Each structure stands twice: as structure tokens, then as C-alpha cells.
Amino acid sequence: MNNWQRILSVARRELRIIRNRPLYFMGSIGVIAFCAIFFLTFLDHGLPDDIPIGVVDEDYSTTSRNFCQQLDATQLGKVVHYNSFSSAREDMTSGKIAAVCVIPEGMNEDIQAFRQPKITFYVNGLYFVSGALAWKDLLTMVNLTNGAVQREVLRAKGYNDAQIMGMIRPIDIDTHQIGNVTTNYNYYLSGILLPGILEMIVILVLIYSLGAELKFGTSRHLMDTSGHSLVTALMGKLLVWTLAFAAIGFVIIMLLYHWLHFPINGSIFNMFIAMFLMIFASEAIGIFIIEMLPVPRLALSVGALYSVLGFSLSGFTLPLEAMPPYIQGLAAMFPIRHYYLFYVQEVIFGAGFAGWWREVIYLLIFLFVPLIGLNRLKKAYIHQNFPKE
């Protein structure tokens, strides 16, 4: 039996194992399908909308009612009226509303008398996104209300609208957003979250697949099937899993940039390259972890920790430049970081090969990492002298 036949024998053996253990299906296709449905529907509108904002109107004037109507008309906010601050505060602490706005009694009279009435905000900071968006919505409406009051006063003094706008807003802002032009959370986050989740799945599933041979005491049978060659055994297993993960990655890219029409300034085919390279690099990391820690439970724990850290250190939520210097260096150890940089250059800037060729080299370097511990894993497979839990 030649080497290729042994690889196919190992691959057929792996397919039988997958068929007999539904955990593999649920841990790969099931998880990524659930996450895709969850994130793509949760962020369907780009930003969370209709965030409940409690309003305690103690003034009951035309101005306060107009303020509430304008706040309710915004995309982000949905006004919930309360008769007292205590009931509004109780609902905010229980998470039913994201913020409370208290309009003081006599606000309209104070405005007419130029006594600067104070509108009080209370924002629930435990829910960062909803709290920040509610704060932004309230602040915007207060500024607009201030402008409306000043406009009416200046109109009464005989100024025309052009002069009034020059006084209310002497400096105009011309904003040009680079990258996420539409300010759409779905476009920006889902394009990284789903590949990041796939990286986690690749690492954990491969660790479990290799560690299960030790856990169930079947590693010697695997070595017999591969002709006592660990490289052949790994190639047989990777033949199955690489095709499976590549198919999942292909569907993710097609889903994002073809079926859902996420904006992309570069080529979708280049994103296929990025996805496949990230999958190969993640497989290499999974193999390396089980080589260094041939104890399934411990290896899975380390693999999960490594995968989660990848989300934090990839830089797509908090810029890497804002992190401590010693943390910035660690970011290069995560394939998702290089996928993110590839993504920025291709999807956002459309830079092409000139923008992401370095990331290709970095991802290819990961493929050599498993060479460090091949002998250690081979001895573990043959002697089975590590804990099986």
C-alpha cells in the first residue's frame, strides 16, 4: 500500500468517526449556522433601533411634548412615558429601558425667561451599546431643541434664516467616513465575527478530533492505518476537515459578499484566498496545541482561550495601536489578526495584492508551527502515556 492509499484509508476512517459522532456536525456546521443566523438577523438594520428611553415629563408644555415627539421619531429611540422618576429608575435598573430623561417642571417658562432649565439624563452604562446610542440620541435632541429655541428668538429680532444658521452654527462640519461609510454594524462586525468564529471552530474541532484518539485509546489503530507515519495520519484527517472547513468558509464569503451584497471594494476571489489561508493557519495552531498538550481536556481549554483572545487582539473592535506595546506584539500570533488586516486592505480599501501580501506570508508561516511537536504527538499516540481526560 503506497502513501496516498494510506492517506485515503485514514480519511475514510475519519469519515466513519464523524458519521458515528454527531458532536462533530453540531460543533462545526451547527455552530457556524447558528452564529450566522444570529448575527445577521440581530444586526439586520445595521444599528440597534427603537431603544427604549424613559421620559418623565414634569412640564407638560408644548415645548416638552414636541421634544418627546421628536425623540420618539428618531430611528434609534422609542419613548416610554413615566409619571414619576422612581418608576422609571426601577425599570432602568431592571434593564427594561436604556436611559431616563427628566424634563423639569417649568422648563418652557424658564426658556422664555432665559433661565437655562436643566434636562437630566440617566443612562444605564451596563449595556454599553444601547446606553451609548441612547445617550447620543438624547444629546442630539437636546442640541436640536437648543437650536430651535435660539432660532425663534433670532427670528423675533428680525434675522433671516441664513443669518440665524450662521449664528447658531458658525462652523459647519463636512464629514467623510473612511471604511464603514454607511456606519453599519452588520457590514463591519459580521465580516470579522463569522470568520473569527470559524477560526475557533477549526481549532477546537481539530483539537478534539486528534485528542479523541488519545481519549478513546484508538491512536494505535490510527498509526497502524497510516503505516506508523504521523504525517500520513495528519494528512488523512486534514484531507477531510480541510475540505469541510473550506466549504464552510466558501459559504461564508458567498453569503456576505454575494448573496447579502455586503459592500466590498476589492475582489471576492481575494477574500476566498484570505479565508482558506486563515483556515490552514488555524488548523496548524490546533495541531500544535494538541502536540504540546496531548491531554484532550487541557488542550481544548487552551484552544478555547487562544481563540477567544484572538477576537480581542485582532484589532477590529479596539485598535491595536491603542493597546500596550507588549500586547501589540502578541497580536501577530493569531491568524484572525492577519485575516482582519487582509480584510481591511481588500474589502474596505480595495488595495489588492499590494495591500495584503505581507499577511499572506504571515499566514503561511503558521503552517510550519506543527513541525515543532510532531515527535511528541507521535510518542503520545504510540505509548498512550498521558491522561485520557
What are these language model-derived features?
Residues 129-146, 179-194, 213-225, 245-253, ...:
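Hydrophobic alpha-helical transmembrane segments
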